[in-house]
Amino acid sequence: MLDDNSQDISIPEAVVVLCTAPDEATAQDLAAKVLAEKLAACATLLPGATSLYYWEGKLEQEYEVQMILKTTVSHQQALLECLKSHHPYQTPELLVLPVTHGDTDYLSWLNASLR
């Protein structure tokens, strides 16, 4: 049973976008850009991440800043395009996760912030 401040949502169809950046300055710049263009309502930057991955056949290990961006389905494509066009990586991490449940007040704020 849901309490009064949470709901299963179809509107505003919130999504979370994950993106990594090579350093805090780049993450700040990307976040400022998408927030100024109202493509995301909130950007949470988590410095201190270490990513391990194979690139061109070689195991890489890099310090990165994990970005968590909150937006809606109707803004996600423009957000992804903006991040990709301004990102220093050839192939940036761009993952979209659906939000299946959330606080009504927060989701209302998120939706209003993108107008």
From Swiss-Prot:
Gene Ontology annotations for the cellular component aspect, listed alphabetically: cytoplasm
Domain of life: Bacteria
NCBIfam families xrefs: PRK10645.1
Cofactor requirement: Cu cation
GO BP term (any one): response to metal ion
Any matching Pfam family: CutA1
Function comment: Involved in resistance toward heavy metals.
Binding-site list for Cu cation: 19, 86-87
SUPFAM superfamilies reported in the protein's UniProt record: GlnB-like
Quaternary structure and partners: Homotrimer.
Main location (coarse class): cytoplasm
UniProt-recorded name of the protein: Divalent-cation tolerance protein CutA
